[in-house]
Amino acid sequence: MEMLLFLNESYIFHRFRMWSIVLWHSCVFVCAECGNAYYRGAGGCLEKPFCAPVKFPFSVKKNIRILDLDPRSEAYCLSHHLVCPKRFPCKATSLLLIPEG
């Protein structure tokens, strides 16, 4: 499965389906190698809330894992599987709920 990495954008598409994304301000971090993204559930520690100036092209309601990443770094894989070399490091995470509308 091929996925593309967009920096300084707020969404990513693959065959017209929105995939989960990690945001740092207006930057998007997704896996561009294994094509695996994780947004289901709230596993991991929930800490300080995270705000990002994000606008989506359509209404969406998803739980998105927010990682404490440097926006200058490369994309990290959101998958919990260990098969991807870009799997995210063990850092504090928080949960962002994007409301519909």
From Swiss-Prot:
Organism domain of life: Eukaryota
Family to which the UniProt record says this protein belongs: Belongs to the UPF0377 family.
Protein name: Putative UPF0377 protein YBL108W
UniProt lineage: Eukaryota, Fungi, Dikarya, Ascomycota, Saccharomycotina
